[in-house]
Amino acid sequence: MLTNSKYHDFEEKIVKVVNPETVGLDSNILKNIRTYLDETYVKDGKYVGTLTLVARKGEIAYLDSLGYMDRENERPMQEDAIFRIYSMTKSVTSIAIMQLLEKSKFRLDDPVHWYIPQFKDMGVFQAGVYPNFVTSKPKRHMTIKDLLTHMSGLTYNFMYRTNIDAAHRSSDVMRAENLEDFIDTLSKIPLEFSPGDKWNYSVSTDVLGYLVEKLSGQKLDEYFQEHIFEPLGMIDTGFNCPEEKKSRLASLYEHNPLGKPNLMEV
């Protein structure tokens, strides 16, 4: 049996990468990943850089960096690079709320306004523009399950489809400095539809984050750290990147109309 494992020295821990064959993978096939990414994306300038990890049976079998983490300063992609995960935070928030469900802190069918009173009188949009709306009473109250399934009637400011999307841009809802202000402003904007009627990608998970705070008695970042990140050994995950780790923080890019990455200022 092949056992020639490799050890990668990261800044805060040693990461073991086993021989792929020991976990039922093929080394030669895995090598094709680098070739494909390089020829299809990196050389063509579609991606600035990539970092790939393949794991099986609890073991890391493939770890490879390619291109740059900072194109402008020609900093090669590091194997321990830190990335902004943005909406992947939703999965962490959903885990947190389900942990609290396991502790019987709430039921999935509980109305949200039991825990967030400001949501009790939210109407459904009928006509008007921000801040003057005509609304109707929803068919039923929004539940915590609606938040988890994005069927709450809420929306996002970047959708550019409806007057409610526009209201999210015109109001200060996405510029709120804390969850309390976010919830207070959000509660004054009508719902796009009655909860449960449709699916719509939205700020529902942000509301769940506020519920985590209300139900646990902890700030969201503290809850994540104590109940998710520390137990899983996620030493590089958080809402802010500490000063001592910023050298590992990859620059952020977005695609321009030509499909090429442009540096974003954040």
Predicted regions and their residues:
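Short, compositionally biased leader-like segments
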Residues: 2-30
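Short, conserved catalytic-motif segment at the N-terminal edge
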Residues: 21-85, 105-107, 121-128, 133
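Short linear capping/connector segments at secondary-structure termini
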Residues: 16-20, 68-70, 111, 115-118, ...
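Active-site SXXK
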Residues: 31-38, 52, 58, 84-112, ...
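Short, surface-exposed loop or secondary-structure junction motifs
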Residues: 2-4, 10-11, 122-266
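Short beta-to-alpha loop/turn elements within the nucleotide-binding domains of ABC transporters
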Residues: 64, 110, 218
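Alpha-helix C-terminal capping/helix-coil junction sites
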Residues: 42, 101-102, 187
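Extended, well-ordered alpha-helical scaffold segments
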Residues: 29, 115, 223-227
